[in-house]
Regions:
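N-terminal leader/linker segments that precede catalytic domains of diphosphate-processing enzymes
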Residues: 3-175, 179-193, 200-311
Length: 311
């Protein structure tokens, strides 16, 4: 079986936080949490009802975390999606003999009015051994990446972006990619938009192939690059088009990106046959594997006739 193919595949809707929240420890009604005006009062906290948990789960703000940030974290799509995942078929609280007792909200990074990144620690215990399961979480949510293959004069090329990646302290060659910035989970629309922003290439929506949709449904039909510490789920897409030699030359070394968002991007075009040796990007290597195996199994949709990539 495969995940359903199609261009309307979206992330499942998240339940409102009100369906999870039972009470706040400070008592009373109103906001999710309420910090006391007394300087010696404990940090903001609340309890949430999580189906599958032994009882109400306490959520606490780390020392120094403002009440406003704590409230935004509790209300964020990132936090609600993580709680939802606990209850899925392979969820920690449904598939294994694990219990969740407390969550410590440690940090919040805002992208404008939206919570972009969330850092928290979950106390999860194996019910049989009573041993704690590593529970440090860097939540960043849903993302997309696109393997762009351009054919020119009998040669197939892949388009990569080169940009500074501060967490690894280096510049990195990788697939054009981006984060989903809303709760609707529009993977295909985001993929097309990110490619245009990062490369200047205008893609035809109907020509996009969702490679991760070819996975078995039990996988969730997304790629998880670092599940030991990060919740990121990536939808990998394929785009195939034909271009002339002048277009390939114009793309090579082209500087792109949204400068106002700190994106300083340079394009690199490499022969597809050398792509697997040209980058250490997990998105690219995963996309290559999916693309090649789908071709081998005969389940890759045929490329659209006469599809031209436009700049």
């Amino acid at each position: 079986a495969q995940c359903l193919l199609g261009f309307s595949r979206r992330a499942p809707p998240l339940p409102p936080l009100a369906s999870l929240l039972i009470s706040r420890l400070s008592g009373g009604a109103g906001a999710v949490c309420m910090a006391s005006s007394d300087a010696a009062a404990p940090q903001p906290s609340a309890t949430v009802a999580v189906p599958g948990a032994a009882g109400p789960v306490r959520v606490v703000a780390a020392p120094g975390l403002p009440e406003a940030d704590f409230r935004k974290a509790m209300d964020s799509a990132l936090f609600r999606r993580w709680l939802e995942n606990l209850q899925t078929e392979k969820g920690l609280l449904t598939y294994g003999k694990l219990s969740l007792t407390q969550i410590l909200i440690q940090g919040v990074d805002m992208f404008g009015e939206r919570v972009g990144f969330l850092k928290f620690k979950a106390d999860i215990v194996d019910e049989e051994t009573k041993a704690k399961v590593p529970g440090i979480v860097f939540a960043r949510g849903l993302a997309v990446a696109v393997l762009i293959l351009l054919e020119s004069k009998g040669q197939t090329y892949a388009v990569l972006t080169e940009q500074a990646r501060v967490p690894i302290g280096k510049f990195m060659l990788e697939l054009p990619a981006g984060m989903l910035d809303d709760e609707k989970g529009d993977f295909v629309g985001t993929a097309v938009r990110e490619v245009e922003e990062e490369t200047g290439i205008k893609l035809n929506l109907e020509d996009m192939v969702d490679l991760t949709a070819l996975l078995d449904p039990t996988t969730g039909c997304r790629m998880f690059p670092s599940p030991g510490g990060c919740d990121e789920e990536i939808g990998l897409f394929l785009y195939r088009g034909r271009v002339d030699e002048e277009t390939i030359n114009a793309l090579q070394g082209k500087e792109t990106g949204l400068r106002e968002h700190g994106e300083l991007i340079k394009l690199r075009v490499v022969p597809y046959s050398q792509l697997w040796r040209s980058t250490a990007d997990a998105k690219a290597l995963s996309a290559i594997a999916l693309y090649e195996m789908a071709k081998k199994e005969g389940i890759l949709p045929l490329p659209p006739r006469g599809s031209l990539a436009n700049l």
